[in-house]
């Protein structure tokens, strides 16, 4: 698995340190292939992201000079597809934040603890990110295909072959293999066996 680069940005250095620990604990449940870098200003974060992109950014909204929304706008204007999770004490900003396509929104002063909320969000995030991984399928006629997991609708077993039905393709990709091998290969991606010949992608 490729190491994830995670950024945390908050102008409050005490909160920044606390968030780093909470985020570390939440991700450690699923993987050790990640690094967390912290930034006390939006400008510092954007500069670091330009040098080497982050996949996940936890971003305080209410910061001086360059706000979290300013940072998010720059990221989206540059066509960055990173996952943004806004963190703020101002719940009224949740609707405005939707303009920047955030993955989630964490309230600092919510009744649910930040730790509990973070745990839920990271679980959801890890499941979502798995769907953006690619697999290589070898069709006996059309050759090799790199396919996103989320584009696989379902898999059908037919004699000694597997038919992969892919979003946007009229004909399935036909790869040699058994449904048992397929089950083991895609177990971590939340595929479900609904029949002895079929696996569907949830």
Q: Would you name each region that the model predicts?
A:
Residues 13, 40-44:
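Acidic phosphotransfer microenvironment of two-component signaling modules
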Residues 119-202:
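Conserved binding/recognition cores within well-folded domains
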Residues 2-23, 57:
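Conserved acidic segment of CheY-like receiver
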Residues 27-40:
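Short hydrophobic/Thr-rich beta-strand motif most characteristic of the beta2 strand and flanking loop
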Residues 44-129:
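CheY-like receiver
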